Amino acid sequence: MTRKFLHTSDLARAVGVHPNTVRKYADWGLNPPVERTPSGYRLFTQQHLDCMRLARLIYSAPYPGRGFRALGNEIVQHAVMYDWQGALEKAHEYLAIVRAELQNAEGAADLLEHWVQNMVSISGNESPLAIGEVSKLLGVSIDVIRNAERNGLITVPRNTYNNYRLFGKREIERLRIIRMLGKAGYSHMAILRMFLELDKGNIRDLKKTLDTPRPDEDIFTAADRWLTTLRAQETMARQVIELINEITAS
């Protein structure tokens, strides 16, 4: 039976991109090798269109970091090698990782509310600690603590005699929440945004504040709205699984 070939323009129309983008996907290895006519025209097949649809779906989502892009690349490469079962397995792995990250991020944001309530009852009568002592207590480097201070996440009082930092209970607890939110994937900008509201006495909707850039934040990353990013990744992963199942069923 004669194979049905598709032209560059056919793929471009099917996925809604410029023809040059189709050529780039082939050059970048996001499509299987492409046959050419004696005159040099590319001859695509349904396999190329399927891979193009898959790659467009994966790469159209915001880049979240934390190894997601590498796993997305693996899904595409399995498809390029005609290994749709391998692509499906990797897609399910992707979805499981995203859901675990989302659960972790949601849990950290929920713990934030509990922390805020406890902060109200914290007294400042304990003997302050030096930065090295805080580093050992929290299991973070001194540079991490200094970086939090430089980025405005914490203000640390100083000894009037030697200018050494003095970390009281409030500062230490604030560093704990910075560490927790950072490990959960939230950016320094998101944490700072939350603290700015908290320091003004606004203790409601801090979870929403973590996920909502202010109007003056002209440039922001995926981690500046981490919950939204992860939910978008979850949706994308489910769509990838549906697409692969559709392709293999046809």
Map each language-model feature to its residues.
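Arg/Lys-rich, alpha-helical DNA-contact motif
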Residues: 2-15, 27-38, 42-127, 169-250
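Residues within the helices of the helix-turn-helix
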Residues: 8-9, 23, 132, 146
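Short alpha-helical "recognition helix" segments of helix-turn-helix
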Residues: 11-12, 134-136, 148, 191
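Major-groove DNA-recognition helix of helix-turn-helix-type DNA-binding domains
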Residues: 19-38, 141-162
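Ligand/cofactor pocket segment of small-molecule handling proteins
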Residues: 127-133, 152
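Short helix-capping and hinge/turn segments at secondary-structure transitions, especially at repeat
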Residues: 136-143, 150-159, 172, 180-187
